[in-house]
From Swiss-Prot:
InterPro entries, sorted: Mediator_Med17 (IPR019313)
Family membership noted in the UniProt record: Belongs to the Mediator complex subunit 17 family.
Coiled coil (UniProt feature): 172-197
Keywords: Activator, Coiled coil, Developmental protein, Nucleus, Transcription, Transcription regulation
Gene: mdt-17
Protein name: Mediator of RNA polymerase II transcription subunit 17
Lineage, top ranks: Eukaryota, Metazoa, Ecdysozoa, Nematoda, Chromadorea
């Protein structure tokens, strides 16, 4: 440092008190009620408006109005300002009339003036607080206790409890009496309103307005309703996903004025679109394409039975309908019209099936000479029951498919999935979508099918089930030996399974238990054809031919007859049972038709018996001498001799076999 420079040293405060006073000037006391802001209203846009809470001054003023000052001060205390000098009043008036008062300037009192100001304000706040506490203490709002004062809780006495209960009972009784009076008055007014006697027009308008909003609330539980300006409209569309309130599917809602002759009507009046003001039905049936039914495949152009169209003369009748019926019928018409249009579009796209569309009738080839027929029928828009035509089962299935299609969400939301737990190497585990090529992915992909394609499968299965049921009924009615019974194991839309049970009552006498000789075979029905499956797992494909199904059932019965003959020949009741030389259920006759047979030999080896069971015919029985040595035998001595099956003793196959075996046992 140079000699000419001045050294400025920092000035330290003389004491810490002076520093503290410069930083903190007085004490701030905030006295106000701890109230939350109350909600005044909530707007339609969701904005909440609050009430500004009361300040401490407002709260003190409200409490001060409740204080009886005469009791605190005394009635004889004089009013301090009662004696006022009239000259002072004149001075105040002159000041008020003369003009504005000059602003008073607080004189400076040194560095402690601001501190004195804040202390004075704090003192005023404390004085106000003491006044509030004294008021609340003297009026039993709050009693101050010291630390040493014991806290005692006064328990209510029995007299107090009984008094309180009695008071509560009295108030409850009064409340119930008032409620009874209100209900009685409402009942009287309701009775008067029903008879419409002595009621004012305003009251009737109030009743109609109340009923209108009640029915409108009931309508909103089922239908989509909204208000646009001064109009109330609804939506008839049936789509769950997609566009709502489309113009062709909107109905208007209005209020009608009811009179005495319209008591049963609804106060809500709806106006549906004119193209939907008719009742509809979509009939599905299976018809045969032949000469007899050729004229009934399409409608007669001159027949106006199912071709109803809206007329202006029916507008008054439509208005008198209840809104529940009108909206339900109109939506059903919209649904069936769209479905029939979609089915016709899908039928045109099918390349392997011929289809014809004419006069709201769709014919599409099913199989062989059978056609699937869709007919859209229209009826007047009025109350009454409509007779359901077509196949009821197919109508219900089509309705269920439509509802299922509308309830299906085709766009699946994205979600995380865990990797499968495998024992493959890491390189194979992490292949992801690269595990299959494009051809394999497309082969395994589940493709959506249209309603028409699924209906064709269901209708084909329906026709085949009906055909198999008729065949089973004929088999069980014709065949008495053995007895054939059938029952359904499972029934589905596209696959079903029927079980045939063959029994013979004479087996109980020879075998003892019928369960051991019971034989079954099955009929598997799909949309493509029918196949008969034996108990051994042999399947016979019958396609869609009822004659082949009948033939397969009779063949299974012939196999059962072979089993029955073999079982009876080995029966332990025989002293010398017969021996089975040969049994072939796959044997053929000279014409190449299936003919299961069995060859028996008695114990003495003197006679051979041949049973041949032709399908759909009586069995043939042949007998000849047993061949001991084929080299030395003479053909004329060992020829098969045919026995007349109808002349054998016994009414059933079991009895005839029993009689024949008894006769040839020792010969």
């Amino acid at each position: 440092m140079e000699d000419g420079d001045e050294v400025v040293e920092p000035i330290e405060p003389e004491s810490e008190d002076i520093v503290n006073l410069t930083k903190r000037l007085g004490v701030d006391l905030v006295l106000e009620s701890n109230d939350d802001w109350k909600i005044q209203e909530i707007g339609f846009d969701g904005v909440e408006r609050y009430l500004q809470p009361e300040t401490f001054t407002d709260h003190v003023g409200k409490l001060a109005r409740k204080v009886e000052w005469t009791k605190l001060v005394g009635t004889k205390s004089p009013y301090e300002n009662s004696k006022v000098d009239p000259e002072d009043e004149l001075d105040d008036e002159n000041v008020a009339k003369g003009g504005l008062n000059e602003e008073l300037v607080t004189p400076e009192a040194g560095p402690w003036s601001s501190v004195a100001k804040y202390l004075h304000e704090s003192l005023n706040q404390l004085n106000s607080l003491l006044d509030v506490i004294s008021v609340t203490k003297s009026t039993d709002y709050m009693k101050a206790l010291t630390v040493l004062d014991p806290i005692t809780v006064q328990e209510p006495t029995p007299e107090t409890i009984s008094t309180n209960r009695g008071t509560q009972w009295i108030w409850k009784r009064r409340a119930l009496q008032e409620a009874v009076q209100v209900l009685d008055m409402a009942q009287k007014q309701r009775q008067r309103a029903s008879s419409n006697l002595g009621l004012s027009a305003d009251y009737m308008a109030h009743l109609q307005r109340t009923k209108f909003f009640e029915e409108l609330r009931e309508m909103r539980e089922i239908w989509r309703v909204r208000k646009v300006g001064d109009y109330i409209c609804g939506d008839l569309s049936y789509h769950i996903f997609g566009w709502k309130y489309d113009t062709p599917a909107i109905f208007d809602i209005s209020r009608r004025s009811l009179s005495n002759n319209m008591e049963n009507l609804s106060i809500i009046e709806v106006s549906v679109p004119k193209d939907l003001a008719r009742r509809s039905m979509l009939a599905v049936s299976i018809v045969q394409d032949d000469i007899q039914s050729g004229n009934g495949l399409f409608r007669d152009p001159k027949d106006k039975k199912y071709t109803y169209s809206y007329r202006e003369s029916d507008s008054e009748k439509v208005k008198l309908l209840h809104w529940k019926d009108s909206l339900k019928w109109a939506q059903n018409t919209l649904l069936l019209r769209d479905v029939f249009k979609t089915i016709c579009t899908d039928a045109i796209k099918l390349r392997n099936r011929l289809s014809i569309i004419r006069d709201n009738v769709l014919l599409i080839h099913l199989f062989d000479d059978y056609l699937l027929r869709f007919e859209l029928q229209w009826f007047p828009f009025q109350t009454g029951e409509i007779k359901e035509e077509g196949d009821i089962y197919l109508n219900r299935v089509l309705r269920e498919m439509i509802i299922g299609f509308e309830c299906t969400k085709f766009i699946r939301p994205q979600f995380f999935c865990s990797m499968p737990v495998t024992h493959l190497p890491e390189a194979l585990d992490l292949r992801g979508c690269g595990g299959f090529n494009t051809a394999q992915i497309e082969e395994r992909a589940v493709r959506s099918r249209s309603i028409l394609q699924r209906m064709l499968d269901v209708a084909s299965h329906r026709a085949l089930v009906t055909m198999v049921s008729d065949v089973a009924e004929r088999v069980s009615r014709i065949s008495l030996d053995p007895t054939v019974q059938y029952r359904w194991l499972n029934c589905g839309r596209t696959t079903s399974r029927m079980m045939f049970n063959m029994t013979s009552k004479d087996f109980e006498m020879y075998i003892g238990t019928i369960s051991s000789v019971r034989s079954v075979f099955f009929a598997n029905i799909s949309s493509d054809g029918v196949e008969v499956e034996t108990k051994d797992g042999i399947k016979m494909k019958c396609q869609r031919d009822p004659a082949r199904v009948m033939y397969a059932c009779q063949y299974a019965m012939c196999c059962y007859s072979v089993t029955m003959v073999s079982t009876m020949s080995r029966n332990n009741n025989w002293v010398t049972p017969f021996q089975t030389m040969c049994a072939n259920v796959f044997a053929l006759d000279e014409r190449g038709n299936p003919a299961p047979n069995i060859v028996l030999c008695n114990q003495a080896a003197t006679r051979s018996i041949l049973f041949v069971f032709h399908v759909g015919m009586e069995p043939e029985v042949f007998v000849r001498r047993f061949i001991v040595n084929e080299e030395t035998m003479k053909p004329e001595e060992h020829e098969w001799k045919k026995l007349c099956y109808s002349r054998l003793h016994g009414a059933t196959l079991c009895r005839k076999i029993d009689a024949l075996l008894v006769f040839l046992r020792d010969h």
